[in-house]
């Protein structure tokens, strides 16, 4: 039921959008990553980043989505309200949004105040998406992507993750290469690393 709920959160907005989908096969789990970014007026923007991961050892499917509704208040800056949903927590947030994009570089940053409905605590969160795709020749671009997520209560670290992708992108916006997904949990920053390969497409 939760998987259906996560999917429906991405459906209300129609029209021209930026969509990126990646399939990732790692040594510990397989992941599907989707990024949805839409400017639907001069001021309003909707951003969502979702993953579905399948763990080989536990045979568990773990859905997760981070989404924000943003309102521009200045050049590249805005205010933001959203929610981070996983199988462990539902975490609403309010904060700021920063976005900038050109032919080779795209960056989105969302620092926010958060509330964990599981821990019943307020805290701080940060989501960052960075893509760098400089041109190599007429057929190929170098492709790199970094996603950083961190959640802290005012007492301790809760969870963080880093998604790293390095590879090539062709003229049809198909991407392929190597990568890793790194996660840290708890105050001791217990770390897990999932190395693998990916293939993706931008629409």
Q: Which role does the model predict for each range below?
A:
Residues 42-48, 75-79, 103-108, 135-142, ...:
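Repeated loop/turn-to-beta-strand initiation elements of outer-membrane beta-barrel proteins
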Residues 23-33, 54-63, 84-93, 114-125, ...:
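Solvent-exposed loop/turn segments connecting transmembrane beta-strands
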Residues 38, 71, 98-100, 130-134, ...:
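Residue-level signature of outer-membrane beta-barrel architecture
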Residues 99, 103-148:
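Detector for outer-membrane/organellar transmembrane beta-barrel domains
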Residues 1-21, 203:
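Bacterial Sec-dependent N-terminal signal peptides
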């Amino acid at each position: 039921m939760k998987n259906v709920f996560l999917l429906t959160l991405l459906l209300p907005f129609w029209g021209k959008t930026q969509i990126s989908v990646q399939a990732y096969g790692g040594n510990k789990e397989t992941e599907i990553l989707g990024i949805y970014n839409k400017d639907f007026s001069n001021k309003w923007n909707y951003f969502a980043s979702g993953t579905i991961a399948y763990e080989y050892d536990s045979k568990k499917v773990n859905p997760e989505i981070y989404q924000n509704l943003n309102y521009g208040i200045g050049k590249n800056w805005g205010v933001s309200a959203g929610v981070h949903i996983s199988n462990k927590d539902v975490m609403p947030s309010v904060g700021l949004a920063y976005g900038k994009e050109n032919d080779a570089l795209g960056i989105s940053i969302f620092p926010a105040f958060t509330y964990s409905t599981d821990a019943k605590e307020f805290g701080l969160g940060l989501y960052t998406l960075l893509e760098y795709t400089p041109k190599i020749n007429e057929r190929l671009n170098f492709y790199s992507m970094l996603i950083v997520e961190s959640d802290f209560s005012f007492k301790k670290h809760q969870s963080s993750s880093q998604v790293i992708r390095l590879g090539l992108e062709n003229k049809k916006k198909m991407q392929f290469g190597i990568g890793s997904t790194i996660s840290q949990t708890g105050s001791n920053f217990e770390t897990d690393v999932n190395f693998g390969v990916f293939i993706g497409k931008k629409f």
